[in-house]
Regions:
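Solvent-exposed loop/turn segments at secondary-structure junctions
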Residues: 67-70, 96-99, 127-131, 180-184, ...
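Short acidic, glycine-rich surface-loop motifs adjacent to enzyme active sites
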Residues: 59, 80-100, 186-187, 262-285, ...
Length: 661
């Protein structure tokens, strides 16, 4: 049947223009890797290709696993694999978070030195920034679902540029992002918050902006997981999920963001381990191994000329019935350019060489893939030796400007979902008695602390298992307060617990909330006026009653907690919308825009108001000298600009007797 949706029409062109705020720079440098961009590139590609032996050419088709958090024996094993097989690249992981950007850079230099003839493509999953893999050592921007709440899509372009800058600084060339899956299934165990939401237009626009920022910054972006992993309740890491819909449905929903991205220059696409009968009629046959899905749908219908990566071949979405190396042959047969993370490189290479000799694999097509890979390397600057400068790496990754960008992004993502009693801002707060209540966190939270900066507060906390006696006591104690500012904590990103978590029967519910927490929250909502802030996944609303005021903050990140408190008290405008439908009373697109004409003082980074953190930090030395010489026992310094406190520190003591700091 003719694929009418993908025909060039004025309507589609108008729709694309309406969807996407086109970036000011050229992000299409990787759009066509099937042809050389100029004579210089063609000469380099042809000369390198000609100099490679057949086995070395085959090595370019593989991207191997490497960890930055392992011991020297493991690193030597990776180096030996590089020397033996001459792979096209490495995909780096840091599952324990014990690896650091410095260790990553050191290993990158070591591995590149082992591949002097053709530098390696270094790839990572930085869907929401370098902090996704190097938590605590680099900046984590918000996850995609939180970004889906933003209405100013230019912020995603800026995020892409910043992540690209950080990637290049640490020697990463490929970012396996953006996630282009439309997440319209609340039970999805693997996509969820990694998606920009349930609306195809919003997903396409956000994914485009992030892609454009990455590629303008010199990093190859990768749209995943083709043809769309959003509408399933299974995880392709563990099984082969089915997407059982007709082609018309795929065209109008799942494939929609991929079409927008391929039309606008995305350089690579990752094929998913999904069974999609409308693309390949073979039963339980993954799209990652489907010539029909890749050659007909992706290459022909979507007119894609970039690199095609498989998803990780180690995943159980690749059926285990295949003989060793057979799936790798099938992946190349289907039209993938790069086999990502083969289960066993010895078996994979042996099977591919055998298939090539037997004629099962088309040599000409494989060499086309090799040349696409070489063109990508050339455009990424890998026609020259690669070495990462180790000095000042942490400082260069964690700049004040990057943190200020994150602050703007988080601020724009917070969504006021409900405010039935017009409470937001609390204009007459001097006449109100406030309490804060953190449910699911027994320690004083950042949110509670910042709420306390605006009015006298009594602070309360509960564990995840509230218990009858604590519930009764709190419900009674909180009666004396006019407003209870509730923060909900400990929410998982996925509906089911991770394999390492042992759920408590009858206690652990979806997204990690307990029956005890939900019952307590329900009673609290019935008996008190609450302002609820959810620091986690909005799909949790399906197990709640609608509160009078609901602020969706998406994450427990301290920056989100600070800004949530400021927003409740009228110091930070609210612009976010719901990226998904989470309850009948909280639908996609819902969000009350709130601009506070007379703002209370808020908190921000100096760079957010045109000042410099480094310049303000010079005060530390001046004050230390003052206190050290006895010119003063101590002091407090507060700097505010544009209604934002950007510096607030205390030094020394109140008196020379040093009785009180």
């Amino acid at each position: 049947m003719a694929n009418t949706l993908f025909k060039k029409t004025p309507l589609l062109a108008a729709l694309a223009s309406a969807l996407i705020f086109l970036a000011a720079h050229d992000s299409r440098r990787f759009a066509n890797l099937s042809q050389s961009a100029d004579l210089q590139e063609e000469k380099w590609v042809d000369s390198v290709f000609a100099a490679l032996s057949e086995e070395e050419r085959l090595g370019q088709l593989f991207m191997l696993r490497a960890h930055s958090d392992m011991d020297s024996t493991y690193h030597k094993m990776v180096e030996d694999l590089i020397l033996k097989y001459k792979p096209g690249g490495l995909c780096v992981f840091n599952p324990s978070y014990l690896g650091t950007p410095e260790k990553h850079a050191e290993l990158s230099n070591r591995y590149q030195a082992a591949s002097p003839r053709v530098p390696l493509l270094i790839a990572m999953d930085f869907e929401n920034g370098v902090g996704m893999r190097y938590k605590g050592n680099a900046i984590s921007f918000p996850r995609a679902m939180m970004l889906g709440a933003i209405q100013d899509n230019r912020l995603l372009y800026e995020m892409g540029r910043e992540v690209a800058r950080e990637c290049r600084r640490m020697g990463v060339h490929v970012n396996f992002a953006p996630v282009a899956d439309v997440n319209n299934n609340a039970q999805n165990p693997v996509i969820g918050e990694r998606s920009y939401g349930e609306d195809r237009h919003n997903v396409a626009a956000k994914a485009y902006q992030y892609m454009a920022g990455l590629q303008d910054g010199g990093v190859l972006a990768c749209a995943k997981h083709f043809p769309g992993h959003g509408d399933t309740d299974q995880d392709s890491h563990d099984t082969l999920p089915a997407i059982p819909y007709r082609r018309e449905r795929l065209d109008s929903l799942e494939l929609f963001p991929f079409k927008m991205l391929t039309e606008n220059g995305v350089g690579s696409v990752m094929t998913a381990h999904l069974w999609v009968p409308s693309l390949d009629k073979r039963v339980n046959w993954p799209t990652s191994l489907s010539e029909s899905a890749i050659q007909n749908t992706l290459r022909k219908d979507l007119n894609f000329e970039g690199l095609v990566f498989t998803d990780a071949m180690e995943m159980k979405g690749v059926p285990l019935v295949f003989a060793p190396g057979e799936a790798d042959v099938l992946a190349l047969q289907a039209g993938n350019d790069v086999v990502l993370l083969p289960r066993n490189m010895d078996e994979a290479m042996g099977a591919v060489k055998s298939a090539l000799q037997k004629g099962t694999l088309d040599r000409a097509k494989l060499w086309q893939s090799v040349k696409r890979i070489l063109r990508a390397k050339y455009r990424l600057g890998l026609n020259a030796p690669q070495r990462v400068e180790l000095a000042n790496l942490s400082r260069d990754l964690n700049t004040p400007e990057a943190l200020a960008l994150k602050h703007r992004i988080v601020s724009n993502a917070l969504a006021l979902v409900r405010d039935e009693k017009n409470l937001i801002g609390f204009p007459n707060l001097e006449n109100l008695k406030f309490a804060t209540l953190a449910i699911g966190d027994t320690n004083r939270t950042v949110f509670q602390t910042y709420c306390g900066n605006y009015a006298p507060m009594a602070h309360f906390n509960t564990p995840k298992e509230v218990g009858d006696s604590l519930e009764t006591k709190l419900l009674d104690t909180l009666r004396k307060f006019d407003i209870v500012l509730v923060g909900l904590y400990g929410i998982r990103t996925t509906p089911k617990p991770a394999k390492s978590v042992n759920p408590v029967p009858g206690v652990d519910t979806i997204y990690g909330l307990t029956h005890s927490e939900l019952d307590f929250l329900r009673k609290l909502n019935q008996q008190h006026t609450i302002a609820l802030t959810v620091f986690g996944n909005p799909y949790t609303y399906g197990w709640m009653d609608a509160p009078p005021l609901l602020l969706q903050a998406f994450t427990e990140d301290p920056m989100a907690q600070q800004l949530a408190a400021q927003s409740l008290f009228g110091a930070n405008d609210l612009n976010g919308i719901m990226p998904v439908t989470a309850a009948p009373w909280a639908c996609f697109g819902q969000g009350m825009k709130k601009i506070f004409p007379q703002k209370r003082l808020g908190y921000a980074l100096p760079e957010s108001v045109g000042m410099s953190t480094d310049s303000l930090a010079l005060m530390d030395g001046i004050v230390s000298e003052m206190v050290g010489t006895g010119a003063a026992p101590g002091c407090q310094i507060l700097v505010a600009k544009d209604n934002k406190i950007v510096w607030q520190k205390s030094y020394g003591h109140f008196t020379y007797e040093q009785a009180q700091a």
